[in-house]
Amino acid sequence: MGGKNKQRTKGNLRPSNSGRAAELLAKEQGTVPGFIGFGTSHSDLGYVPAVQGAEDIDSLVDSDFRMVLRKLSKKDVTTKLKAMQEFGIMCTERDTEAVKGVLPYWPRIFCKISLDHDRRVREATQQAFEKLILKVKKHLAPYLKSVMGYWLMAQCDTYPPAALAAKDAFEAAFPPSKQPEAIAFCKEEITTVLQDHLLKETPDTLSDPQTVPEEEREAKFHRVVTCSLLALKRLLCFLPNNELDSLEEKFKSLLSQNKFWKYGKHSVPQVRSAYFELVSALCQHVPQVMKEEAAKVSPSVLLSIDDSDPVVCPALWEAVLYTLTTIEDCWFHVNAKKSVFPKLMAMIREGGRGLAAVMYPYLLPFISKLPQSITEPKLDFFKNFLTSLVTGLSTERTKSSSSECSAVISAFFECLRFIMQQNLGEEEMVQMLINEQLIPFIDTVLKDSGLHHGPMFDHLADTLSSWEAKADAERDPGAVYNLENVLLSFWGRLSEICTEKIRQPEADVKSVLCVSSLVGVLQRPRSSLKLHRKKTAQVRFAINIPEAHKGDEKSMSSEGENSEGSDGGAQSPLSNTSSDLVSPLRKKPLEDLVCKLAEVSISFVNERKSEQHLQFLSTLLDSFSSVQVFNILLSDKQKNVVKAKPLEITKLAEKNPAVKFLYHKLIGWLNDSQKEDGGFLVDILYSALRCCDSGVERKEVLDDLTKEDLKWSSLLQVIEKACSSSDKHALVTPWLKGSILGEKLVALADCLCDKDLEATTSESHSSEQWSLLRLALSQHVKNDYLIGEVYVGRIIVKLHETLSKTKDLSEAANSDSSVSFVCDVVHSFFSSAGGGLLMPPSEDLLLTLFQLCAQSKERTHLPDFLICKLKNTLLSGVNLLVHQTASTYEQSTFLRLSVLWLKDQVQSSALDNTSLQVLLSAAGDLLGTLVESEDTSLLGVYIGSVMPSDSEWEKMRQALPVQWLHRPLLEGRLSLNYECFKTDFKEQDTKTLPNHLCTSSLLSKMILVAQKKKLVLEDNVLEKIIAELLYSLQWCEELDNAPSFLSGFCGILQKMNITYSNLSVLSETSSLLQLLFDRSRKNGTLWSLIIAKLILSRSISSDEVKPYYKRKESFFPLTEGSLHTIQSLCPFLSKEEKKEFSAQCIPAFLGWTKEDLCSINGAFGHLAIFNSCLQTRSIDDKQLLHGILKIITSWRKQHEDIFLFSCNLSEASPEVLGLNIEIMRFLSLFLKHCAYPLPLADSEWDFIMCSMLAWLETTSENQALYSVPLVQLFACVSFDLACDLCAFFDSITPDIVDNLPVNLISEWKEFFSKGIHSLLLPLLVNAIGENKDLSETSFQNAMLKPMCETLTYISKDQLLSHKLPARLVASQKTNLPEHLQTLLNTLTPLLLFRARPVQIAAYHMLCKLMPELPQHDQDNLRSYGDEEEEPALSPPAALMSLLSSQEELLENVLGCVPVGQIVTVKPLSEDFCYVLGYLLTWKLILTFFKAASSQLRALYSMYLRKTKSLNKLLYHLFRLMPENPTYGETAIEVSSKDPKTFFTEEVQLSIRETATLPYHIPHLACSVYHMTLKDLPAMVRLWWNSSEKRVFNIVDRFTSKYVSNVLSFQEISSVQTSTQLFNGMTVKARATTREVMATYTIEDIVIELIIQLPSNYPLGSITVESGKRIGVAVQQWRNWMLQLSTYLTHQNGSIMEGLALWKNNVDKRFEGVEDCMICFSVIHGFNYSLPKKACRTCKKKFHSACLYKWFTSSNKSTCPLCRETFF
């Protein structure tokens, strides 16, 4: 119903809310008794039957049913529909007794609602009725008469679903046998209801005119009338004859009413259609009644014969036929010649007005029922009738529809045959039919290309066959004579029109081919039985006639049977005979016609070279290939013997005119033909070959023609015709298999391949020659080659040679060469080969194809389109190979040789990424095809054959560069004590992939493809392949600064899904892990790292790992493999297992000799294991670690020379280096985990710190050896130890100090820390001076991270006491002392260094210096006095010079990006370093700015304004800051009131932490923006106000959303927590309202000011409001408020600083200093100076800056007050 106040869909009325009303009525039984009155007036008793009283109703009907029945009386469609559906459900669900209670009220409801306007309601009503019937069954009987009339109407509903539902309900109520009885039982009531609807009802009586629109009333009335007419027809069909008699009076009464007959002229087509259907039924079932009303029936039906409505037409014509049959004197009541026939002829002339398919099948029965009296003169009548039919065929509507055209043609021939049958002896009629109708009709169809010829030819052939059959079967000589005369006349006239068509010089091809088609159909007529059945099925007046009226049926159709029966009887024997047999009556005239047409055609060909006549001749000969016809085609001159030919051919030509014609005429035509569509000439050739007596003769002729006479194009067409027709193939099979054709094709292949390789341009007909080869190689039927097998092999060999030579040609040459044609030929050969065995040359060809597909374009020089062709050709060949029944790996040459070639490619050849990708793709395609092989072992054997042996794998692994070790060594995951590699990987940086990578990826690709077949490989081949791929992937992953082609290699594997996750599903993890453990225990190194990666990626627990090594003792004595295995397992072992491993090592630390200390099974190896366990914090026994420290200390005493203190490392052995590295690692880990709370003795601290400093000195003294990996590792570990010591002492707390030795802290600060940084700072400068362009990931710069991290702990004093060489720039303007300027000039350039650790270390060191620098400018501040017009002072020159260089770099990186579009900078890229350095430089400048005094800040800000550096920064920041600067982990926490953002959290500039690198630049950009807004608010405000609108909005929106609240809170907090005291002024702050209140008091004067921060602070203006004002004049008050507002808006500082400036200004005012009369302020708002420049005339003083502005803006040099010249 919709909402109570919603817009209604119709009527715009509010809903009736019928559901609620019905419920109320159901409840209030006392108020409304029963059903009386609801929905009607009190005079209408509603639904109450007369037999019951109102007081009994409530007890009989269920309350739910009452509510539903009330709903059904409502007008709303939706209410009724839902109520009816609910009623149906209740009928199904409720018990029978409850449903039976509804029956007394159902008839009236049903009768009303079954006529409802809405079709959905009507459908639902019938569906609900069916459910009611199924429930109550026979109890419906008492109420049947009340509903049957409407029920019958419902079955004729114009809405098919409603009608179907009513029929379903009727069938549910009565079985088919009982339905007539049920109808008969209610016939009187039905007739009464239907007659009332037809005669009494009007639109206004059926519907309420006041509530129902006129259109709806009319529609309902028309539907009711239609249903009533159809229901009457249904009643007539249902009732048996004996029941119909009792209704005759009823029908007479109906037919006597003029209103009934008016329905025949009704404006609604459905009503007329139903009317005519009822008339047909009345004629059929009550013919006597209709005869009595003949005067009304005949005009009503016959005068409507031109009704062209498609709805009415079928019913009308059925009524016409029934009227003619039932009412014999119907023509007495109409004027046929003036009224009926003119309308009929008009319809026919117009082609049935689009209804020919419906109307024309009735024409034959119609004319068969016409009495002779009304057709006189019959010659004119039938002539007019047939002429009208032919005219109708020419209408555009008929020609555009094949069904319409076919119907007209069919009707024409049916009527023609009938008229001929009825008037066979009448010469004049016969001549009219043949000469004036049939022949002109044929001529019309032949002339008009828009008509469909097929139906006409079929009907003509069928007509001739029927006449011939009748002539053969007829016993009356007169009848036979008449029929023969008809046929003779027909053939004579047909010959004339056909010859006339052919004789036209400009006859078009369609016209002449139409003639040949007609002759062909007459030669081989199609089955006429099908047409006959089709015709009889369309005579509808004989259908569905009950048994009682068989006599009527016979009388109605007897004439039709007589007219057509003889046809059918004569045709049946013809239809059973072969279609190729022609009647003798037809054979002679047809042959004469063919010969005559051939003669005419050949004359046109000879004289005018007419191509259309040649095509006609071809089609003619195809149907009539006889010697007589060929004899006609030869002129007298051409009947002599063929000369210059072999004797056999000459003899054959003498005997056979067809062969003679072939040589004299056809060969010349074939060779002269320039058109591609010359196939009709080849058809003539086949027609001539059919005339040869044997296959030998045909072979001789074709062999002779092949040698010299036939062109390649003609030869191609001959073979194509043979392949397209089995009959033609049978004619030429001996020739196709013969040697003449085979040798010629082999020679053709030689010619084509050699010619195209030598000269890339091909002749115009070469594509035809290639097509000929392709056709010859393709197989035909029964797996047999089209030509001889030996010739196929020879051609394949030649094609193979051609493909092999492609590598020697350029890409351009290959594009135009024969390779493309070869691919087409070979592809066709493979595709058509079926299941036949491949010959050896084919397998060699397959191998070459595979090699071309598996190599990159750089090697093959083939364009892309050729590669695609080659691939398709290869796959078709391999597909053929694997489906051979007897194909195995050993038998296949291709499979064996392809394996060898693949192994050679990946193990011996130099492959780059592109080559490998192509190879993998080709191998995958090949394996994908092999998967489909029926031989299950083939795939496994193939992969096993490609698999290298163990020794080959080992050789490839050893060939891999070992630079991968660098990262595991630095990270402490592996330990080595021998020299492993010498140089950076860059020296070996080529594009060639190592063979191991190629081999492992190839085999991985193979097993991925093979998984479709669930392959089981023997001897752990699958696990070995996966292990080798993991080895390759781990090698790539461990490489630092790997060449770009290796990342490309990994990308290729990802793209091809060659990943461990995809391969792991193919093998059990346990077997793979066991294999890896075995290899790790044996070899260590990369295999150990693979185990760690596998355990991590597969989330394998320590309990699952344990079975693989069983006993821990098995790892000892230590080898390199067992050491590396334990180191890799440590992160995944349980704490207890690590303790057990540690326990195995403890005894080994005691009693070592000097040599044993450095060996793997000595101190070095065991200490390495201990370090690995300690690194995972699994050893918490502090005493144990303290004991090991003491042992190491004892080594220092016993074997001092193994400690590399202050020595030359070039003399140290790798074993000693390795031991020192492990000792340093232990000391670092000891400091991190155990130094506190474990108290150490002074000697132990001395040992640690002195050793650290000595190792650092060694590192510093051996810079030349940093390229040696172990030396570099030694340096890194020594820096780590120094860094850990610095971190330890930096984070020390008072609690820890109490447990440390007394002088330890002072010793650290005074000696050790100073010693560390005095060594590292020069070392850093020297290291980066030699390698300016190396990134932090390179080998040489690996030590930068620990070195730089250590330098971040350097103190300011240590920096200032540096010993760096002087570095000064002559042009630099500076107030700094030389040693400080040197430090700046040395450290500042490091902000642009390529390595991030250096940039961050330089920032940290410079950041400690920045607060010291402004003081040096402060001391020289007087030199920047008031004399300058706009004084400006540069921040440190070194920083500004660097900033200038950085701005140029940033312009290149970000300049082209619009402001507001976020740029993502790739971590550690070159651009990353540029942006990082730029942002760090600005952080330093802002730190410097914040440390300066107010006066200095004014000078610095003026400098920044002049250089516009700040503007550039702000533009760049809005390209770098993220749209949502929220931390990732807090972005999800929506409930958090204050989520963490990049503005609330300080950026951590960590050197070692790399996990946050993607957020490094965005966070840093936000930090710089925050500092800029905080420290330079006035300058940012100025930039914002001057920016364009788009940028203005972006900045305002972003700042208001993310920054303003943070800054406002910080500003208010700084006021609240400020310790600054003002004499005479108090300051308070309110955080909630963002207000600051300042109260200034001096003597009796009180001034209170309220400062309000804007929502977009600091971009918006700060408002100053007045509070208390005591003792101050209004004007002065306003001036002071304006001054404060100006200070807060234009000064770059905090609110407290602005208030301090304002207070000083007021104080000076009270001290007697006058305001400057230009700015009306005592203290200048920008440079904080007092008014000093006095006018000599008026003695007023002004600020120097204000005067300068006055002079420049006014262009005068006068005093602003007295206007006298200012001196």
Curated annotation (Swiss-Prot):
Pathway involvement of the protein, from the record: Protein modification; protein ubiquitination
One GO location term (cellular component): cytosolic ribosome
First-level EC class: transferase
Swiss-Prot/TrEMBL GO biological process terms: protein autoubiquitination; rescue of stalled ribosome; ribosome-associated ubiquitin-dependent protein catabolic process
Residue spans of the HEAT repeats: 59-96, 100-138, 273-314, 335-372, 380-418, 433-473, 509-547, 621-658, 676-714, 1067-1104, 1183-1226, 1315-1353, 1378-1415, 1476-1513
PTM info: Autoubiquitinated.
Coiled coil regions, renumbered to chain: none
Zinc finger (RING-type): 1716-1763
PROSITE patterns with a match to the protein in the record: ZF_RING_2 (PS50089)
Top-rank taxon: Eukaryota
Keywords from the UniProt entry: Cytoplasm, Metal-binding, Neurodegeneration, Repeat, Transferase, Ubl conjugation, Ubl conjugation pathway, Zinc, Zinc-finger
Region annotation (Disordered) ranges: 550-583
Reactions mediated catalytically: S-ubiquitinyl-[E2 ubiquitin-conjugating enzyme]-L-cysteine + [acceptor protein]-L-lysine = [E2 ubiquitin-conjugating enzyme]-L-cysteine + N(6)-ubiquitinyl-[acceptor protein]-L-lysine
SMART domains xref list: RINGv
Tissue: Widely expressed, including in the brain and spinal cord.
Primary localization class, coarse: cytoplasm
Protein's UniProt keywords contain Iron-sulfur: no
Chain intervals with Polar residues compositional bias: 572-581
Keyword Membrane tagged: no
Further comment: Was named listerin because of the 'tilting' or 'listing' phenotype observed in mutant mice.
Name of the protein this chain belongs to: E3 ubiquitin-protein ligase listerin
Organism of this sequence: Mus musculus
Upper classification of the organism: Eukaryota, Metazoa, Chordata, Craniata, Vertebrata
Underlying gene: Ltn1
